[in-house]
Amino acid sequence: ETFETIFHGSEEERFYHEAGEDKGFMEDTGNHDARTEGMSYGMMVCLQLDKKEEFDRLWKWTRTYMYMDEGPGKNYFAWSCALDGTRNADGPAPDGEEYFAMALFFASRRWGDGEGIFNYSREAKAILHECVHKGEPGHPGDPMWEPSNKLIKFVPGLDFSDPSYHLPHFY
């Protein structure tokens, strides 16, 4: 019942909205935007409840609008987008990437890998590779995990963490 309300309830009740033929997003109702945190949590809920269509819609919206293919955040996800997909941010929030990777690994096990962006395990590995290896020789940018202590950062360019980003049950 809760899933149905959040994903398919009335316009006043739901957080999930379909966009076009094959995309969907989770609205942060307090800020009227879509955030990597909410998108990745939505994917995790869909995964746990075996809702592949909604999962794929969320992932496609994320890859279409949030994925950054240039600049310092290249191969990361913009942490906030307007509901039309316009980016509100040029940088990531590492908890989103962390949840995206885990949801994609779980999706690979539940539904198997598909083609393109729906090759879930390949996408998850690519996210984690960027998160860990940015900043190494030949790989510009800042990693999401601090190499010296292995703690996830609050944002890649800063040297402090956020305790809410630590998800030991993922490892």
Per-range role (PLM):
Residues 1-9, 14-15, 29-36, 71-74, ...:
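Extended ligand-binding clefts on enzyme/binding-domain cores
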Residues 1-97, 103, 110-113:
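N-terminal carbohydrate-binding/catalytic regions of secreted carbohydrate-active enzymes
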